[in-house]
Every structure is written in structure tokens, then in C-alpha cells.
């Protein structure tokens, strides 16, 4: 049988495995753990997680003149009922009657109808209210402002109260999306809030009301819920919005950096679990925390969404058909979801393993490095990590670095920025008196869709150095990280997915005990890796190397210093800058010889 597999290059002799192991992360650092000691804890409600929001709401409701609060939330449908209940429970007023009673004396063929008001005395009066909190995430002008109706035969008139009347004396909760989709509502609502008076208007711009209808005073406060984009759009349309409106936000992510914050969050989880008739032990709570850290990419911040937490608890309980959940149960539903959503990911990995997409995980190659990327497919709820081969070829030229993706409009602006930073960093580090006498072309091999982001700038820098110094890079090490012009390595997103993507390819090909990834030191707090990765690191089969700057990255990849440090170098340990300088000098000598040869001939 013919073997069509590519020949794998020999393993690098320059990469010091023992030196690298000493710089790799310990397996205990790969998953975060809660530090609370007491469990179970006293259950707390959602608003215990939102001290800033509760204080803002309280100040708004007690303020004598403020009538509009813009509140940033994740999804209005998720928080409207919570907010309505919070206001009803914590700002309950003595039951009193607000509003008026409209008395209508119907007209006849000889007279117009006559309408007048009298103070409301009971809730049976047509425009009476009790000052309650009401919410309506969708409404039209008739539902919001009420309506004026005329019977088609008798011509009798009827006044129908709207939400602004029913919430008189209390709070009305609306969505920014409704106001943006029907922006004509906003002008009238603003007038009502600023004047605290309700005036009747005809619904038809070319028809007048058949009779005068007296206005009446309102005592109304409105809270508008919306995400940041919706509130920003509304603020653009209403330039002076925050001259008369207040602002607060329900935090999408809450801090769990301190022990007391972890206790508060744990108490909230217990409250939610009790509402679903679910029991949790401490290990289950800790696993839930680890899964939420994967989503937030920060072990000190986790998602505060009640809907998200409720879904996770219900999914785990439904999947296991149990009400007493353990850590194994949460891991089980997590793995089931990965499999359920994982068709495209598995096809992508299969292409790499079948060498339809060429990614090397052993040996060493000049001018090639494995970068780490995150793939997102529209219409799917998850993303996943994938190694991508970045290659660089240099030739004599004028110093231009050609970004093939950018030239073919397959890369975004942030990618272009990262590419230019990598070039500037290299020139700054080498301290060249003039531009390089080389040109280079950089390619993300077998990449056919649009790419963006600067998380490959560290990989781009290293592959440029490899090509210029004519030194090979180890293919069993993948790398991610963004850099600045001074060579510092900065944080990137999706680090868990990136690590697990490269690990999966290495694991399915067979772990050699040398494979690993280089990540920014600052991303350690993002780590919440799978048990498989944790086990492989613990057994010395896979390594994760955090770096702070390009010097550490180059030392790991090449086994050499990037710059001369007044050491006694041998041919095998000569610094990278000296190798590049020697190549530049060789180019200059070649040009001089060509020049004299031209005149002698």
C-alpha cells in the first residue's frame, strides 16, 4: 500500500527540553478553585450580587425630580420581571389612589360630548392606579398612552387608559428596543416625564378630537432597559438624554476575587438551586464555577445572568435525571453539549489529522510556526481552537514585509496593526542603522476565510526571526500572544479553546512528551482547562509555557538569546541578533563583490 503521508522532520536539537520544563506551568494552575470554607451557605437573592445597581435604583426612586432611569442590562426580557419584583418588594408604598376619574357626558345630534375630571376615589374609577411597578417590553402607542374611541353607530366616546396611566404613582419599565423601533413614542414619553402631565392627542394627524379632554397630572417614573448598543443609539438620537435621565447598570459579570464575594455568589447559586428543587455539594459548586470561568475567560469574573445559571442547573438535572447534582454531573452535561455542538469542530480536526490541512506537530522547520486561533462559524453557539500554520520566506530586497492576507483583503484592520507592530518591534530590538536588506512574505497557510485580531503578532515576530536567522522552529510548540513595539507580550482571548485545540491534535496523533503551547503570562488567570489537558500536564506529556516578553519566547523556541548579553557564546548558542547581523553583512559583502565584478568586466 502506498503511504501518502508527509515525511516528518527530525526533532530539534536546539530546544532544551529540561530548561523548558522548568518554565512550564504546574498542573494545579490549569483549573481555578473556590477558596470558601463554609458550605452550604445562607441563600441570597440576585440583587445581593448587584450592590451598585440596587443603590442606583434606590436613589432614583427616592429622588424628588428624577423621572427617567436608563439601565444597561444584558437581555431586557431576563431582567424586567426581576426588577419589577425588586421594586414592589423593597419600595412598597402605603396603598393610595392615584389618578382621576374621567366623567363623560355623551353628546347628541344637538351638542358635543362634554368631558371633565374628578379626583379618583377608588380603583374602580377609570383612570385610577395604586402606584405599582409595571413592565411592558413591547407596546404600541395605544397600549402606552391609551386611546380615544368613538362608537361607529352611536358616536359615543370612550377613553381607554394606557400603561402611563396604570403606572401613575409608580414605576413603568420599558425596553429601549421598543422606543428605537417606534421612535415617535419617545418624543411624547419625554414630554410626559418632563412635565409630569398627560395631554390627549388625536391618533390621526389630520383629525382633531371631537371635544376637549382635560389634561391631568401624573406622578410617573420610567426605567428603560437596554443593552449598551441600544442605549448608545438612543443617546445619539437624543443628544441631551443624560441632562434629564439617570443611568445605572446591572453587571453582566460579577467579581469573585475575594472570599466574601465567592460566598455571596455561592449563596445565590444555592437560592437558584432551591427554586429548581436541586441540591448541590461543594464539588458540584466548584465545577460550576470552573465552567463559568471558561465562558468569562477570567477566574475573578463570572457570568451573573440568572437565565444562564438556571439553564445550566436545569440542563444538568434533566441530563442526569437527578435532583442531587455532583461535579461529575456538570462535567457530563458539558461534554454532552460539546459533542452536540461539535460536528464542525470534529470535521476541522479530521482535515488536519488526514493532512488535508497541513499542520506539523513534530520536528523543526525554518520559517514555519504553529499559531493558535479561535474559529467561529455563524449560526453555531460555540467556537473552538484550531492550530494554523504561519510561514515566512525572506529574500534579498528593500525591507518590505508582505502580508499576503492583508493584500488579498482576507484580514481585518486589527490583524494589519498586529503585523506592523511585529515589524516595528523587530526593527527596534535589532537596533538597525537602516532598513533590512531583505524582503519577506508572511502567510497564514490554507486560510481561506477572513481573519482578524492581533493574537498572532508574537508568532509573526518569531517566524520572522526564524527566517532571517535561518534557524528552525520546533513544530511541537504552538504559540499565541500579542506584542507591543517594545517586545512585551500581552493578553489574548480564547486561550482555553486555543490550548485544547492544539492539544487535541497532538493527543490524537500521539503525545510525545515534548508538545506544548506558549501563552502570555497574563492569561494564566483565564485558564480553566479540560481534565484531559490537566492530566497530560500532570503526567509530563504536555506543557504550557507562560512568557512575559519576546526574549523568553525566543529562548524557549530557539534555545538561544535574542540579543547578546556579554556571554561566551559558541556556534550553537550564538544569539539570534548576531546570526541576523551576520546574514546582513554577508548580503553587503555579496553586493560589494558584484559591484567590483561589474566594473572589472
UniProtKB/Swiss-Prot annotation:
Q: Give the species.
A: Haemophilus influenzae (strain ATCC 51907 / DSM 11121 / KW20 / Rd)
Q: What class of enzyme is it?
A: hydrolase
**Protein's recorded name:** Putative Lon protease homolog
> What taxonomic classification does the UniProt entry list for its organism?
Bacteria, Pseudomonadati, Pseudomonadota, Gammaproteobacteria, Pasteurellales
All copies of the Lon proteolytic domain together span 363-560
Q: Which family does it belong to?
A: Belongs to the peptidase S16 family.
PROSITE patterns (alphabetical): LON_PROTEOLYTIC (PS51786), LON_SER (PS01046)
**A Pfam family for this UniProt protein?**
Lon_C
> What are the alphabetically sorted keywords of the record?
Hydrolase, Protease, Serine protease
Q: Respond yes or no to whether keyword Repeat is given for this record.
A: no
Q: What would be an example GO MF term here?
A: serine-type endopeptidase activity
The Gene Ontology biological process annotation of the record reads: protein catabolic process; proteolysis
Question: Does the keyword Hydrolase feature in the UniProt annotation?
Answer: yes
* Residue positions of the active site: 455, 498
EC number(s)? 3.4.21.-
Present the record's domain note: Lacks the ATP-binding domain.
Amino acid at each position: 500500500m502506498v503511504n501518502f503521508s508527509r515525511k516528518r522532520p527530525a526533532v530539534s536539537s536546539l530546544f532544551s527540553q529540561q530548561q523548558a520544563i522548568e518554565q512550564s506551568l504546574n498542573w494545579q494552575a490549569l483549573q481555578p478553585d473556590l477558596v470558601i470554607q463554609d458550605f452550604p451557605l445562607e441563600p441570597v437573592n440576585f440583587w445581593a450580587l448587584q450592590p451598585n445597581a440596587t443603590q442606583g435604583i434606590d436613589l432614583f426612586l427616592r429622588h424628588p425630580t428624577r423621572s427617567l432611569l436608563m439601565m444597561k442590562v444584558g437581555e431586557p426580557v431576563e431582567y424586567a420581571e426581576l426588577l419589577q419584583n425588586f421594586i414592589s418588594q423593597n419600595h412598597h408604598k402605603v396603598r393610595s389612589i392615584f389618578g382621576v376619574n374621567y366623567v363623560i357626558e355623551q353628546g347628541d345630534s344637538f351638542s358635543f360630548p362634554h368631558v371633565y375630571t374628578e379626583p379618583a376615589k377608588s380603583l374602580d374609577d377609570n383612570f385610577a392606579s395604586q402606584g405599582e411597578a409595571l413592565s411592558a417590553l413591547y407596546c404600541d402607542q395605544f397600549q402606552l398612552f391609551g386611546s380615544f374611541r368613538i362608537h361607529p353607530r352611536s358616536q359615543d366616546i370612550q377613553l381607554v387608559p394606557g400603561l402611563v396611566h396604570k403606572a401613575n404613582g409608580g414605576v413603568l419599565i420599558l425596553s429601549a428596543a421598543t422606543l428605537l423601533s417606534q421612535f415617535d413614542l419617545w418624543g411624547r414619553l419625554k414630554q410626559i416625564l418632563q412635565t409630569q402631565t398627560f395631554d390627549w392627542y388625536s391618533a390621526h394627524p389630520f383629525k382633531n378630537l371631537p371635544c376637549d379632554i382635560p389634561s391631568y397630572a401624573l406622578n410617573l417614573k420610567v426605567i428603560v432597559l437596554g443593552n449598551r448598543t441600544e442605549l448608545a443609539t438612543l443617546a445619539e438620537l437624543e443628544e441631551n438624554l443624560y441632562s434629564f435621565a439617570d443611568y445605572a447598570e446591572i453587571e453582566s459579570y460579577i467579581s469573585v476575587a475575594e472570599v466574601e464575594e465567592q460566598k455571596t455568589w455561592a449563596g445565590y447559586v444555592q437560592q437558584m438551586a432551591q427554586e429548581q428543587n436541586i441540591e448541590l455539594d461543594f464539588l458540584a459548586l466548584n465545577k460550576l464555577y470552573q465552567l463559568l470561568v471558561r465562558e468569562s475567560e477570567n477566574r475573578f469574573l463570572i457570568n451573573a445572568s440568572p437565565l444562564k445559571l438556571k439553564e445550566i442547573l436545569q440542563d444538568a438535572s434533566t441530563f442526569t435525571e437527578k435532583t442531587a447534582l455532583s461535579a461529575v454531573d456538570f462535567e457530563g452535561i458539558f461534554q454532552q453539549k460539546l459533542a452536540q455542538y461539535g460536528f464542525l469542530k470534529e470535521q476541522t480536526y479530521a482535515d488536519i489529522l488526514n493532512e488535508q490541512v497541513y499542520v506539523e506537530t513534530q520536528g523543526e522547520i525554518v520559517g514555519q510556526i504553529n499559531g493558535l486561533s479561535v474559529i467561529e462559524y455563524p449560526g453555531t453557539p460555540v467556537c473552538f481552537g484550531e492550530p494554523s500554520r504561519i510561514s515566512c520566506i525572506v529574500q534579498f530586497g528593500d525591507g518590505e514585509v508582505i502580508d499576503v492576507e492583508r493584500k488579498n483583503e482576507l484580514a481585518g484592520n486589527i490583524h494589519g496593526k498586529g503585523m506592523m507592530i511585529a515589524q516595528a518591534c523587530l526593527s527596534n530590538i535589532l537596533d538597525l542603522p537602516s532598513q533590512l536588506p531583505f524582503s519577506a512574505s508572511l502567510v497564514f497557510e490554507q486560510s481561506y476565510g477572513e481573519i482578524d485580531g492581533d493574537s498572532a503578532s508574537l508568532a509573526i515576530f518569531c517566524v520572522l526571526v526564524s527566517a532571517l536567522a535561518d534557524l528552525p522552529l520546533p513544530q511541537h510548540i504552538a504559540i499565541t500572544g500579542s506584542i507591543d513595539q517594545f517586545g512585551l507580550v500581552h493578553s489574548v482571548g480564547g486561550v482555553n479553546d486555543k490550548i485544547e485545540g492544539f492539544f487535541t491534535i497532538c493527543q490524537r496523533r500521539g503525545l510525545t512528551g515534548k508538545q506544548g503551547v506558549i501563552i502570555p503570562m497574563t492569561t494564566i488567570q483565564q485558564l480553566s482547562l479540560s481534565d484531559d489537558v490537566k492530566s497530560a500536564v500532570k503526567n509530563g506529556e504536555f506543557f504550557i509555557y507562560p512568557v512575559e516578553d519576546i526574549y523568553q519566547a525566543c529562548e524557549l523556541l530557539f534555545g538561544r538569546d535574542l540579543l547578546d548579553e556579554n556571554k561566551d557564546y559558541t556556534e550553537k548558542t550564538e544569539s539570534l541578533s548576531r546570526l541576523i547581523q551576520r546574514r546582513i553583512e554577508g548580503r553587503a559583502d555579496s553586493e560589494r563583490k558584484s559591484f567590483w565584478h561589474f566594473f572589472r568586466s
